[in-house]
Structure formats: structure tokens, C-alpha cells
């Protein structure tokens, strides 16, 4: 059994068996939502989990509850003007609070059509929490689809609110979804010699 299964199982509690198909209109099987407002324990890992899962449809009310007003969000890099020119949300958003999450999550959705997003592992040590997984995204400008690993970490205060958030991904891959076929670049990385065109 994977660590994430064990952690999420203890985080969410026991899931009830799906109701018989005849109990619902249309005969669709259903089960209670795993993180409803009345059945989740607020702790650093569960807060982090909820924030990660609001990316496709940012919930400002929830983010105001789970993120401090002066939270700092580091997106992809501390400061990289070239990357920022491709993905304008890249960089350090110091003391912007929940609005940084809304701005970044919304803008990502404007630039990419989001595909599957997985949280493979999530765990914490007190107020320090981390998670990683993968996501698929298709650029809305060129229709290029990429798959990237991601990793995130957060620091959570004693009130179980995030005051520092950092998101990393394979920016070489994700930025390439916006590159035209003619936009090759030559790299000289090997000290033994040679170049790579990508």
C-alpha cells in the first residue's frame, strides 16, 4: 500500500460504501464527498491538500480561510525574467496572501487547458508539509500537450493557515508548450564539448 493511500486514508477517515444503485435518480452509484465541510480534520496536511485541489477552480472564500493575508507564494523560481516573460506568474509574490493563489491559479487556466493532476505523495512534519505528483497541460495558443512532474511545499502556522507556499515543476518542459517549431536554442552544457539544439 502506498504511503499516500495510508496518509489520505487517515486524513479522510473511513469512506462509506456506495449506496445501492436504486436509491438515486438515474441509478448512479454515489458516496459521500471525502472532504465535506463537516467531516475533515483541519491540520497542516489537510489544509495543504485542499489548497492544492482548488487549482482548477479557485475558491477565494476557502483560500481566505486557509491562507494568511501576508502569505508569500514562490512560483517556479525566485526571480527569472525570461521565465516570467513566458509564464507571467513565475517569481516570488511576497506577502500577497490569498490573492496570489487566485491570480496564479486563474492565469494558469487561461494559458493552459488543464488535464489530469495527481498528488502521488503528501505528508508533513508539524507545520512543514510537502507533496509531489504530475500534471498534464495543453497550451491554448499552440495546442501542445506536456506532462510534467511537480513538487510543492508549504509552511503552516499554529492556526492551520498557510503562510509560505512554493511550487516547482519541470519548467523546461512546460515552457516548451509555448515554443513555436522554429524557436530552437543551442545549449552548451557538456564540459567535454558538443552542443545540443532543442
UniProtKB/Swiss-Prot annotation:
Belongs to the patF family. One of its GO terms (cellular component) is cytosol. Residues 1-18 form the signal peptide. The lineage of its organism: Eukaryota, Fungi, Dikarya, Ascomycota, Pezizomycotina. Gene3D superfamilies: 3.10.450.50. Patulin was originally used as an antibiotic and specifically trialed to be used against the common cold, but it is no longer used for that purpose since it has been shown to induce immunological, neurological and gastrointestinal effects. Genotoxic effects of patulin with dose-dependent increase in DNA strand breaks in brain, liver and kidneys have been detected in mice. However, more recently, it has been proposed that patulin might also have anti-tumor properties. Keywords: Cytoplasm, Glycoprotein, Oxidoreductase, Signal. Its EC number is 1.-.-.-. This is Patulin synthesis protein F. One of its GO terms (molecular function) is oxidoreductase activity. Part of the gene cluster that mediates the biosynthesis of patulin, an acetate-derived tetraketide mycotoxin produced by several fungal species that shows antimicrobial properties against several bacteria. PatF catalyzes the conversion of phyllostine into neopatulin. The pathway begins with the synthesis of 6-methylsalicylic acid by the polyketide synthase (PKS) patK via condensation of acetate and malonate units. The 6-methylsalicylic acid decarboxylase patG then catalyzes the decarboxylation of 6-methylsalicylic acid to yield m-cresol (also known as 3-methylphenol). It comes from Aspergillus clavatus (strain ATCC 1007 / CBS 513.65 / DSM 816 / NCTC 3887 / NRRL 1 / QM 1276 / 107). GO terms for biological process: patulin biosynthetic process. It is an enzyme of class 1 (oxidoreductase).
Amino acid at each position: 500500500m502506498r504511503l499516500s493511500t495510508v496518509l489520505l486514508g487517515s486524513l479522510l477517515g473511513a469512506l462509506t460504501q456506495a449506496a445501492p444503485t436504486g436509491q438515486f435518480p438515474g441509478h448512479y452509484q454515489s458516496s459521500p464527498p471525502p472532504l465535506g465541510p463537516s467531516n475533515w480534520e483541519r491540520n497542516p496536511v489537510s489544509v495543504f491538500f485542499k489548497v492544492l485541489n482548488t487549482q482548477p477552480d479557485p475558491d477565494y472564500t476557502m483560500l481566505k480561510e486557509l491562507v494568511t493575508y501576508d502569505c508569500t507564494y514562490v512560483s517556479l523560481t525566485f526571480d527569472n525574467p525570461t521565465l516570467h516573460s513566458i509564464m507571467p506568474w513565475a517569481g516570488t509574490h511576497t506577502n500577497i496572501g490569498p490573492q496570489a493563489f487566485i491570480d496564479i491559479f486563474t492565469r494558469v487556466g487561461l494559458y493552459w487547458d488543464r488535464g489530469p493532476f495527481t498528488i502521488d505523495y503528501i505528508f508533513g512534519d508539524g507545520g512543514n508539509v510537502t507533496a509531489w505528483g504530475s500534471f498534464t497541460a495543453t497550451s491554448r495558443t499552440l495546442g501542445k500537450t506536456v506532462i510534467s512532474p511537480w513538487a510543492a511545499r508549504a509552511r503552516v502556522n499554529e492556526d492551520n493557515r498557510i503562510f509560505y507556499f512554493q511550487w516547482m515543476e519541470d519548467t523546461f518542459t512546460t515552457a516548451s508548450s509555448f515554443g513555436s517549431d522554429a524557436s530552437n536554442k543551442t545549449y552548451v552544457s557538456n564540459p567535454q564539448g558538443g552542443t545540443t539544439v532543442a
